[in-house]
Regions:
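Core catalytic alpha/beta fold that binds nucleotide/phospho-ligands
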Residues: 1-104
Length: 104
């Protein structure tokens, strides 16, 4: 069985969220923070986490900083600990979008 989740994030909204004192550390892992150089990257990772939770069908039932989006040597994203999954993150204009597919 396949489960699919998709999320879209307005990059300017992420920019405002990143201005809040504790937002970054409550949502992103240290590895993700080190990886991100632009607001667009944070927005893409956030969208991937939301898409993952939608695919799981559980809603936001955990701290987002306990989910880690990793990248291989070619830059392909994946979810740490979710072997049966595929992740796609894209940016266009004012938006970042992510789709996650989980399978059993």
């Amino acid at each position: 069985m396949y489960r699919i989740g998709t999320d879209i994030v307005l990059i300017s909204r992420m920019e405002k969220s990143l201005e809040r004192e504790n937002f970054k550390n409550s949502v992103f892992t240290q590895g993700e923070i080190a990886h991100c150089r632009k607001t667009e990257s944070f927005a893409g990772i956030f969208a991937a986490k939301e898409a993952y939770l939608k695919a799981k069908g559980t809603g936001i039932n955990c701290k987002l900083n306990t989910i880690e989006i990793c990248y291989d040597e070619m830059g392909k994203p994946s979810i740490a600990g979710a072997e049966k999954s595929d992740v796609s993150i894209s940016h266009d204009g004012d938006y970042a979008i992510a789709t996650v597919i989980l399978w059993e």
